[in-house]
Amino acid sequence: MKILIMGAFGFLGSRLTSYFESRHTVIGLARKRNNEATINNIIYTTENNWIEKIVEFEPNIIINTIACYGRHNEPATALIESNILMPIRVLESISSLDAVFINCGTSLPPNTSLY
């Protein structure tokens, strides 16, 4: 089974990646490099061809664990880009594949951030 984990360096994504790596072919999707990460196969969204790399990988399962909630005082546009537009781009890119998309959501108290 080929699995794409979106948000592979995050709390949930890193744990799911560790769990699935020994049983399946896993590629992570991340916004920026993390020198402490132990994940072997990563697609960075800063690369010009990141969408094409996802399509070439042909995942059977995509697990979205992306969560930008403003802990670094990101503006609302960054939250919308990460939490809404990024998953939509991935969904549109894999529409021709027979893949399952699993979306994981989180919530925070309203006084925490714009999230």
Task: Indicate residue ranges for each PLM-predicted region.
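N-terminal Rossmann NAD(P)H-binding glycine-rich loop of SDR-like oxidoreductase domains
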Residues: K2-R23
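NAD(P)H-binding glycine-rich loop region in Rossmannoid oxidoreductase-like domains
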Residues: T46-S82, P109-N111
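Conserved Rossmann-fold NAD(P)-dependent oxidoreductase catalytic core, especially the SDR/UDP-sugar
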Residues: I88-Y115
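SDR active-site strand-loop-helix element
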Residues: M6, L29, T65-I66, F101-S107
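A generic structural motif
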Residues: S22-I27, R31
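Rossmann-fold cofactor-recognition segment
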Residues: R31-N49
